[in-house]
Amino acid sequence: DEKISRQIGGQADTSPNFPKAKWDKFTPKLGLRYQYTEDMMVFGTLSRGFRSGGFNGRVGGGLEEATQPYDPETVDNVEFGIKSEWLDNRVRLNASAFLMKFDEKQEELKLPNSGGATGQKTVVVNAAEATITGLEVELQAQVSDALYVRANVGLLDAEYDSFKYTGSDGNAVDLSDRDFRRAPDVTMNIDATYSWDLGGGEAWVRGSVRYLGKHFIDNENTTELANGAQTIVDMSVNYRVDALTFSLFGRNLTDEDGYT
């Protein structure tokens, strides 16, 4: 049948340029916990993460560039910390420290199109070796039946040990020792919720203050595009009765501006 033969023939793809690749990786994980007391536990974790390689698909460099795969990314992670409860479980204090080592880190870059094409292309390259170290502390407290408070602090050092690639113009680009984009050295947050009974339902007010240290928004760490320290305040007023909930929100009440 001619119609059937057309359908079958139309589904065949004999293109010699159809790219194929396969990646696999052993990703072990080891975790240890020790219950020091009934209310305190310490833990440690060793693990390896894996992100598969792939293809960039359509890019401005043409078919040859689009069919060249980028390699997988691996990260080795070490973390240890403590989890604890105090004052009859009304206060919870947790802390952890971690170290992450990236190998063949995949980076998404926006580059000028090559081969005479106009505009930009977005490509993924294995450009970087990187290290992240950090410390996180979290406190939760049921101060009273009506008041709940939560706070956390994060310290982060996220830096590229080696970040080199070839630009579309053929020149070498070296971003080694630059900071990760959108990775403030210091972050802090505190939020509180106060609730009470009202008119057969429940009312509550929630407010939060969030602090972000100075950070860059691009891989090049362009000073003119850096965000300075930011303090962002949010608040909401809420009322729930039966199956209905009414809320009034206020976002970024300090009117902080920044690059995204």
Model-identified regions with their sequence ranges:
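Transmembrane beta-strands of outer-membrane beta-barrel proteins
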Residues: 2, 28, 42, 91-95, ...
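Residues on the lipid-exposed face of transmembrane beta-strands in outer-membrane beta-barrel proteins
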Residues: 22, 30-34, 80-84, 137-141, ...
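Membrane-embedded beta-barrel scaffold of Gram-negative outer-membrane proteins
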Residues: 35, 42-43, 69-135, 142, ...
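Gram-negative outer-membrane beta-barrel transporters
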Residues: 99-101, 125-219
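Solvent-exposed loop segments that connect transmembrane elements
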Residues: 2-24, 54-69, 107-125, 160-178, ...
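Outer-membrane beta-barrel strand-turn architecture
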Residues: 22, 26, 34-38, 74, ...
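C-terminal beta-signal and adjacent terminal beta-strands/loops
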Residues: 101, 199, 210-220, 238-260
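Structural signature of Gram-negative outer-membrane beta-barrels, strongest in the C-terminal barrel
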Residues: 1-101, 193
